Amino acid sequence: KTVLHQQNILTGAVVSVARTVLGTIFALVTNALLAYIISRKRFLFRSQLSLFWVITMYVNGGMIPTFLLYKGLGLTNNFWVYVIPGMVSAFNMLVIRTYMNGIPDSLEESAQLDGAGYSTIFLKIYSPLCKPVYATVALFVAVGQWNSWFDAMLYNRMSSNLTTLQYELMKLLSSVTNQGTSAEEMKNAAGTVTPTSVRAAATILTMLPIIC
């Protein structure tokens, strides 16, 4: 009851659901398209691009340059900062590409003999066959989007209408945990909400949609 009656909890829940749905859809589409492109053996720079994306998995630009970049692009205090940066993931893209590499080339060649273009081959042949890996990647992205709170703190902390459920729960848990622990305060706190109970309630709220 204490958790659910906190300010901005409902707004945060709506934003979290929206970012999870939109972020998953956009990420799945872009990663699938990129994976299809670099899985084509006739694509000239497939090896170089694959190496480039692998490097980005281990080396990033750093927090401050990333913040300045997002600010310059107008993504601070903006809902799309939750969606656009996650549209391309080297890991997810390589997972889909590896799955596509296991699909026989004869299927694509037969479709080309029938006059099918690359878009038709991708939509009508590869996408139906890649449903298992699409579902896996979608689950990865959805769980990551739902559990994320750090980007809300960095980029949208000044906009209460763009807060997320996880960020609000984190602030609540921090405020309860940082309450005084002197003997007198502990005596006066009898019967009030404890950090452990808040942590348990927050855990249930964040896990329930994923479990369902």
Q: Predicted regions span which residues?
A:
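A hydrophobic, multi-pass inner-membrane permease signature
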Residues: 1-212
